[in-house]
Swiss-Prot record:
Homodimer. PANTHER family: 5'-METHYLTHIOADENOSINE/S-ADENOSYLHOMOCYSTEINE NUCLEOSIDASE, 5'-METHYLTHIOADENOSINE_S-ADENOSYLHOMOCYSTEINE NUCLEOSIDASE. The lineage of its organism: Bacteria, Pseudomonadati, Pseudomonadota, Gammaproteobacteria, Enterobacterales. This is 5'-methylthioadenosine/S-adenosylhomocysteine nucleosidase. Optimum temperature is 37-45 degrees Celsius. Rapidly inactivated after exposure for 10 minutes at 55 degrees Celsius. The keyword Transcription does not apply. Substrate binds at G78, I152, M173, E174. Pathway: Amino-acid biosynthesis; L-methionine biosynthesis via salvage pathway; S-methyl-5-thio-alpha-D-ribose 1-phosphate from S-methyl-5'-thioadenosine (hydrolase route): step 1/2.
Amino acid sequence: MKIGIIGAMEEEVTLLRDKIENRQTISLGGCEIYTGQLNGTEVALLKSGIGKVAAALGATLLLEHCKPDVIINTGSAGGLAPTLKVGDIVVSDEARYHDADVTAFGYEYGQLPGCPAGFKADDKLIAAAEACIAELNLNAVRGLIVSGDAFINGSVGLAKIRHNFPQAIAVEMEATAIAHVCHNFNVPFVVVRAISDVADQQSHLSFDEFLAVAAKQSSLMVESLVQKLAHG
C-alpha cells in the first residue's frame, strides 16, 4: 500500500517529512512531494500550498505522479463544534465548499454543477482514524468539514457558515478541493486535522500561537493512521 498525505503549509508537513526514510523530493507545479518510507510504509507527502486551487493542483499532481492508494489530508483547522479546543482532532465524514453558490440554478448551497453537494470520506479510513484516536486517547469530533478561500476570523463570515452549514464541525481552506479531486479519481480519502483556533474574531491570533500545537497533534495522528492502514 502507498499512502498519500497532503498538508498545505511547511509547519503542517515538517514533522512527518523529517521521519521519512530514503526521502526523495519532487518539485512540480509549485508543489513539493516527498517520497519514501514512514515506519516502513510507502508514503508520498505533498506540501500543496494554501487554498483550494493550490490544493486541487497538488492533489492532482500527487495522484498522477505517485499513484497512492488512499489520501489523508492533514494540518490545522478552525473549530466550529462547541466541544472543540486547541489540539483536538477533527475527522471528516463529509467535506463541502462554504463559498460556492449556484443556488440560482437550483443547486444546494456549496454545490458545484456536475458535482455532489458534498464529498463523502471513506468509511474504512474513518474507522481506522477513530481507532487511532481511541488508542492515543485524544479528544476528537467526526463530522462535516467545510472549506473556502478565506480565513474565518470575524462574526459575519462565521455567522454565514453557521447559517448554511449548522452541522459543520470545522472550517479550513483546502480539504474539500482535495476531496473533490479524490472523488474524480475514485481514490478514497479522509481529512484528519487538529484544531488551531476557534473561528472567531481572535482566531488569527490563536492560529499564530497554536499552529505548532495543531501540527504536532495532526502529525501524531497521521503517523498512527499510516501504521494502522499498513499493518492493521
